[in-house]
């Protein structure tokens, strides 16, 4: 059985959001929880909804999106962050990955690339199962003889 992947999307425009929403809707493993174009609003939704993944588009204001990725990587380490953008300059991709994004998705979305990213995200989320805390005592015994 495949785990359901939940997504929150930060888009730079309505066209980008519609494209991402349509591509995600084509995969049965995915459920879109929320989307928006305001970084603070999306940040609050991320904390409230705790999705398994987030797609953050890098547009004209890429610095704000990269700062959001850094912030989410620190505060939501179990969430797989995916950056996306039309501009696929190596510098921008590298900066987003260094900030904490796990993958970069080129826009417009190509079906095979999206499937690969969703497979990686699914593997990442499956490995995030919290281990139960073991309770016990540690007793150390030292010999009184040298």
Describe each model-derived feature in a short phrase:
Residues 29-37:
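Short hydrophobic/Thr-rich beta-strand motif most characteristic of the beta2 strand and flanking loop
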Residues 78-88:
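A short, hydrophobic beta-strand element within the central beta-sheet of small alpha/beta folds
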Residues 2-24, 35:
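Conserved acidic segment of CheY-like receiver
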